[in-house]
From Swiss-Prot:
The active site is at 172 (acyl-thioester intermediate). The keyword Iron does not apply. Keywords: Acyltransferase, Cytoplasm, Transferase. SUPFAM superfamilies: Class II aaRS and biotin synthetases (SSF55681). Catalyzes the transfer of endogenously produced octanoic acid from octanoyl-acyl-carrier-protein onto the lipoyl domains of lipoate-dependent enzymes. Lipoyl-ACP can also act as a substrate although octanoyl-ACP is likely to be the physiological substrate. It catalyses: octanoyl-[ACP] + L-lysyl-[protein] = N(6)-octanoyl-L-lysyl-[protein] + holo-[ACP] + H(+). GO terms for biological process: protein modification process. This is Octanoyltransferase. The record marks 138 as: Lowers pKa of active site Cys. PANTHER family: LIPOYLTRANSFERASE 2, MITOCHONDRIAL-RELATED, OCTANOYLTRANSFERASE. Belongs to the LipB family. It is an enzyme of class 2 (transferase). Its EC number is 2.3.1.181.
């Protein structure tokens, strides 16, 4: 079983983190450890490779960064758990689809830990609430880049955020899509206590643990030439 290191980077400027991901991936060797970075960003909009700038409806004073992941526009900000997956997919024997499935399953498992029901939607990557007054609202977004069989970028899970910046965009390219966080969804821990922004570290490590479990479950389930994009 190939280990995965968990690195908590805390609060970090998006551009600095993006540059670090690219450098890490470019400098990888056959023995470079697989790593998940846990990060929280200051407010920033990011636009994917094929993203349409028209989905930024009202930029205001939040910067826009064009990046090399897939997908459209999204928002990162305080109170959001971001997990970047820097993995050698060939070494792990993972297809990209299996990686996406693992990420989405890990988010669903994390939310279930906090008594929030969620689900995938066909053709719309990310995780959505499956019950309650905000059923259908998006609570997590994902976007990936595969280079030489190695992944970077990852997934963002909304914990306790100022959600108003999401109204300034068409989230992931979908006009009018409601976006919520775990607080809005009524997330509670095993003792019944409502989660809040102070739970960032705890929630981030639950997500990391679920990501590792899902990735290890899928390891070597696919041929080693899987990730070639």
């Amino acid at each position: 079983m190939i280990p995965i290191d968990i690195v908590e980077r805390g609060q970090q400027d998006y551009t600095a983190c993006f540059d670090a991901m690219q450098t890490f991936t470019a400098q990888r060797g056959p023995d470079t450890p697989d790593t998940i970075w846990l990060v929280e960003h200051p407010p920033v909009f990011t636009l994917g490779l094929a993203g349409d700038p028209a989905h930024l409806l009202a930029p205001g004073n939040i910067p826009l960064v064009k990046v090399d992941r897939g997908g459209q526009i999204t928002y990162h900000g305080p109170g959001q758990v971001v997990a970047y997956l820097l993995l050698d997919l060939r070494r792990r024997g993972l297809f990209v689809k299996a990686l996406v499935d693992a990420i989405e399953a890990a988010v669903i498992d994390t939310l279930a830990t906090y008594n929030v029901a969620s689900e995938r939607k066909a053709g719309a990557p990310g995780i959505y609430l499956s019950a309650g007054p905000h059923q259908g609202a998006k609570i997590a977004a994902l976007g990936l880049k595969i280079r030489n069989g190695c992944s970077y970028h990852g997934v963002s899970l909304n914990l306790a955020m100022d959600l108003s910046p999401f109204t300034q965009i068409n989230p992931c390219g979908y006009a009018g899509l409601e976006t919520v966080d775990m607080v809005t969804a009524g997330a509670r821990d095993a003792s019944g206590r409502a989660v809040d922004a102070a739970d960032w570290q705890r929630v981030s490590h639950v997500l990391a643990d679920r990501l590792v479990a899902q990735l290890q479950h899928r390891a070597n389930a696919h041929p080693a030439e899987a990730a070639t994009a």
